[in-house]
Amino acid sequence: MKTTLAAPDERLRAALQHRIDRKTKPLGALGRLEALALQVGLVQQTETPQLRQPHILVFAGDHGAARAGVSAYPQDVTWQMVENFLAGGAAINVFCRQMDLGLSVVDAGVNHDFGKRPGLVDAKIGPGTANYLEAPAMTAAQRDAALERGRGLAHALAANGCNAVGFGEMGIGNTASASLITHCLVGEARGADLATITGRGTGLDDAGLERKRALLARALARGGRPADPRAVLAEYGGFEIAMMAGAMLGAAEKGMLVLVDGFIVTSALLVAHALAPQILPYCVFAHRSREPGHRVQLDALGAEPLMDLDLRLGEGTGAALAWPLVQAAVNFLAEMASFESAGVSDKT
């Protein structure tokens, strides 16, 4: 996948900062909301940013390694949770309804036939990845197809008027995949070994966590640490992770704001960032997950998330919960009076 991504033009920064500073408040009094308003303005290249048709994309895919016992739940939970999303019964559905966010579920590679369903995007690459304990998770052709399909989904959202997209995922075993990706791309540079990055995922007990760590060590011994991020993705990734990476790049290409959820979503961003480092200014990091590897990822990207609520659900729930903060940042910039317009005396 080739991308022509460019970082936002910084020439607007001074004008935006002046506009923020002249609001009726002490300098910096709105804290990180001020930086967020500045970021959205730079992404949209305007002093008066607007949020249009915000949407959450939840990418679902199965993992061959799940059958080896890297998760506390059976693989069938992936398709069952997709059905739950489509029925409106999951946490992400509740939060999207509350925040008035659009929601689409993307079948990137679930081992189930859903048929044509409202709210479901059929982008299936295959019925789950191969078991990376035995072979690469996907072929180069499958990886490239997933990246391109993700890119196309983001472009389609932009064509329909969306300028802010949040990312979520569902896939039993995908915290294991995210751990391997994270270790290969940033773990060694951050002094974090694979065992440190690997967490409990869906709730493994101590014995389950040790089994997961041992299985991932076996996978790493087989596949090694490829230098090319595309090779890392093919070796250990999931179809949902690959498709998210492509969609993130596609969203940034269209000048969209990218809301980053937790550990698995950030593993997709690590791939996207390795392919196009200019993506970072487009990204709003919603929260810090309880997964230990998420802190490693955030540190590697120099990111400070908006919230720390001990979330570890995925689905894009953190992105949805952070949305009102993004709205607040844009709204104060648009609606708050300046010292001049309000006739309020400035600091002497």
From Swiss-Prot:
Catalytic reactions of this protein: 5,6-dimethylbenzimidazole + nicotinate beta-D-ribonucleotide = alpha-ribazole 5'-phosphate + nicotinate + H(+)
InterPro entries noted in UniProt: Nict_dMeBzImd_PRibTrfase, Nict_dMeBzImd_PRibTrfase_bact, Nict_dMeBzImd_PRibTrfase_N, Nict_dMeBzImd_PRibTrfase_sf
Source species of the chain: Azoarcus sp. (strain BH72)
Name used for this protein in its record: Nicotinate-nucleotide--dimethylbenzimidazole phosphoribosyltransferase
Annotated keywords: Cobalamin biosynthesis, Glycosyltransferase, Transferase
CDD domains in alphabetical order: DMB-PRT_CobT (cd02439)
Gene name for this UniProt entry: cobT
Family recorded in the similarity comment: Belongs to the CobT family.
Pathway(s): Nucleoside biosynthesis; alpha-ribazole biosynthesis; alpha-ribazole from 5,6-dimethylbenzimidazole: step 1/2
Any one of the GO BP annotations: cobalamin biosynthetic process
Domain of life: Bacteria
UniProt EC number: 2.4.2.21
Keyword Transmembrane helix: no
